[in-house]
Curated annotation (Swiss-Prot):
Protein name: Tryptophan 2,3-dioxygenase
One annotated GO molecular function: metal ion binding
InterPro entries named among the record's database cross-references: Trp/Indoleamine_2_3_dOase-like, Trp_2_3_dOase
Record-listed substrate binding positions: 34-38, 100, 233
Function: Heme-dependent dioxygenase that catalyzes the oxidative cleavage of the L-tryptophan (L-Trp) pyrrole ring and converts L-tryptophan to N-formyl-L-kynurenine. Catalyzes the oxidative cleavage of the indole moiety.
Catalyzed chemical reaction(s): L-tryptophan + O2 = N-formyl-L-kynurenine
Keyword terms of this UniProt record: Dioxygenase, Heme, Iron, Metal-binding, Oxidoreductase, Tryptophan catabolism
Keyword Metal-binding: yes
Signal peptide stretch: none
Native source species: Herpetosiphon aurantiacus (strain ATCC 23779 / DSM 785 / 114-95)
Family under the similarity heading: Belongs to the tryptophan 2,3-dioxygenase family.
E.C. number(s) listed in UniProt: 1.13.11.11
Subunit organization: Homotetramer.
Cofactor note: Binds 1 heme group per subunit.
Record gene name: kynA
Length: 260
């Protein structure tokens, strides 16, 4: 007879609490915090991807109400992961450097799930695929690269709501990063002036974009505070590389602000 389901067995608490394996000698007290925070990030990234996939489906089904609800959930998660930076910043540079060497070449740059999030949001770079080419998870990332982005689903949503989206946008090469489109901007200006329901969804997408930029900014400042302008453990330029990634995912929604 099988045992009754418990809190611990349902959530696999024993397995979960055995996943933190410090590598430093001692180990250093602060390494556990570093591991826990990054593992929690990965769990939130998993949930964000789950929500983004759902959001794409909702947009393609023209379900505005549930789409807004899904975006609100993602925004709340983003606020949570931004707040985790506050916890990380309780660690001083000396405390981090006490175990930094134990990380060897491991780096947040190697987070496959965050690269998946970037791809879903339309920020696609072939070099990222090459970086993960030797890993078993490369196939999953390649699939994300080949799939339409959230913005493509949004354009489909606009089409369902009666807006004539140019064929070159609907049929665009989805492996390319998004670039601003004057034609789409003209449509969006009309949306804002005439359709409160759809323009409200546009504003929630702006919130989403801003939320990711806020997290990137806090991440940059945390890295600067901890290691200054040193090279990252994975070989990147550290804070300088992170700062270069603070750019909007949905440029058309930002470009129309001056014309509203």
């Amino acid at each position: 007879m099988s045992q009754a389901l418990t809190y611990a067995s349902y959530l696999k608490i024993d397995e979960l609490l055995n996943l933190q394996t410090p590598r430093s000698h001692g180990p250093e007290h602060d390494e556990l915090l570093f591991i826990v925070i990054h593992q929690v990030y990965e769990l939130w990234f998993k949930q964000i991807l789950h929500e983004l996939d759902y959001l794409c489906d909702l947009l393609r089904a023209n379900d505005t109400g549930r789409a807004n609800q899904s975006i609100r959930r993602i925004l709340t998660i983003l606020k949570t992961i931004v707040a985790q930076v506050d916890v990380m910043e309780t660690m001083t540079p000396l405390q981090f450097n006490a175990f930094r060497g134990s990380l060897e070449s491991a780096s947040g740059f190697q987070s496959l799930q965050f690269r998946e999030i970037e791809f879903v949001l339309g920020y696609k770079r072939p070099a990222i695929l090459q970086h993960f080419a030797a890993l078993p998870s490369h196939e999953r990332l390649e699939q994300r690269y080949q799939e339409p982005s959230l913005w493509d689903s949004f354009l489909h949503y606009l089409q369902l709501n009666g807006y004539a989206i140019p064929s070159e946008q609907i049929g665009r090469d989805v492996t390319q990063s998004l670039v601003a489109s004057p034609a789409i901007q003209t449509i969006l200006i009309t949306v804002y002036r005439q359709n409160p329901l759809v323009s409200n969804l546009c504003e929630r997408l702006i919130d989403l974009d801003e939320g990711f930029q806020e997290w990137r900014y806090r991440h940059v400042k945390m890295v600067e505070r901890t290691i200054g302008m040193k090279q990252g453990t994975g070989g990147s330029s550290g804070a300088a590389y992170l700062a270069s990634t603070i750019k909007p995912f949905f440029p058309d929604l930002w470009a129309i602000r001056a014309d509203l």
